[in-house]
Regions:
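Short, charged early-sequence alpha-helical segments and their helix-coil boundaries
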Residues: 46-68
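N-terminal acidic leader/helix
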Residues: 1-29
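Short runs of predominantly hydrophobic/aromatic residues within well-ordered alpha helices
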Residues: 2-5, 9, 35, 55, ...
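Amphipathic, non-membrane alpha-helical rod segments
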Residues: 30-49
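Charged, amphipathic alpha-helical oligomerization/scaffolding segments
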Residues: 8-11, 15, 37, 44, ...
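Short intrinsically disordered terminal tails
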Residues: 1, 68-71
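Short, surface-exposed loop/turn segments at secondary-structure junctions
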Residues: 24-32, 52-56
Length: 71
């Protein structure tokens, strides 16, 4: 599978971040519902990209950043 990294970084990541912000406002950033959504959606997107290492590492960075924000 050839991956369009430009599309991934310019569309997929920003769209996911926007949905993440919306979800955190809906259910609360610290809620189990939010974190389940985070893990589920990250997993789904990574699978769409056949768990490509750059994709999974990027989402790993985002997940770690979110955890730090949560305190």
């Amino acid at each position: 599978m050839r991956i369009d990294y430009i599309d991934f970084f310019s569309r997929v990541i920003p769209e996911w971040m926007a949905r993440s912000n919306q979800k955190s406002q809906e259910v609360g950033f610290g809620s189990d519902t939010y974190w389940l959504w985070v893990v589920t959606t990250i997993g789904e997107i990574c699978k769409q990209y056949n768990d490509d290492s750059l994709v999974t590492e990027q989402f790993g960075l985002l997940f770690n950043w979110l955890e730090k924000q949560a305190g």
